[in-house]
């Protein structure tokens, strides 16, 4: 009986607490985030952060995902996400990965991407900012991911196997 009383009291307390929340209220904006919109329509968000010191994170989100694909295109957004790491206009082949790993950004842990039903996201985390040119290079990579993924035939053939293996292991 004591457990039942405690359970009812806890449920009542939670219900009362939840009743105080208005789900329609907007989440307050972080006053330290600078936002803006470029002429090309891209919205940006910049926030200064001291931790970890001497490092920055870069993310770019594209409103492209599986929901835009028809039956003949299933998996295309995910495939393109993979291809972004196989060369761009300014960093052909594996130059992007080689450069970022040379400055301390590890592929997989700090350099990655993901595709969902409505979005594809690319990220570089813990990019060192102390050496001149690294921030410019990171911004160039974001630019290339948005406009200039190389899509070389040999890289497409190579990545096809990677995607097929990923699908095989996901299904098991």
Language-model segment annotations:
Residues 10-18:
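Hydrophobic h-region of N-terminal signal peptides that target proteins for export
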Residues 20-26, 107-111:
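Short secondary-structure junctions
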Residues 9, 26, 50, 112-114:
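Generic marker of residues within folded, mature protein domains
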Residues 20-24, 42, 81-87:
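A broad, low-specificity signal for short, low-complexity segments enriched in glycine/proline
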Residues 52, 62-77, 81-172:
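Active-site-adjacent, His/Asp/Glu-enriched structural segments that form or flank metal-binding
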Residues 22, 26-61:
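Mature N-terminal segment immediately following signal peptide/propeptide cleavage
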Residues 2-9:
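Sec-dependent signal peptide recognition
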């Amino acid at each position: 009986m004591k457990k039942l009383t405690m359970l009812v009291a806890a449920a009542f307390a939670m219900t009362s607490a939840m009743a105080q929340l208005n789900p329609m209220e907007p989440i307050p904006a972080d006053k330290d985030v600078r936002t803006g919109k470029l002429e090309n329509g891209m919205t940006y968000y910049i926030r200064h952060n001291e931790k970890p010191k001497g490092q920055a994170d870069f993310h770019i989100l594209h409103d492209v995902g599986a929901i835009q694909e028809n039956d003949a295109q299933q998996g295309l957004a995910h495939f393109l996400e993979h291809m972004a790491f196989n060369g761009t206009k300014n960093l052909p082949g594996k130059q992007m990965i080689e450069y970022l790993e040379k400055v301390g950004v590890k592929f997989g842990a700090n350099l990655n991407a993901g595709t969902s039903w409505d979005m594809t996201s690319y990220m570089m985390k813990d990019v060192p900012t102390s050496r001149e040119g690294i921030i410019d290079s990171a911004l160039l990579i974001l630019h290339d991911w948005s406009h200039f993924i190389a899509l070389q035939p040999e890289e497409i053939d190579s990545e096809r196997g990677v995607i097929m293996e990923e699908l095989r292991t996901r299904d098991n």
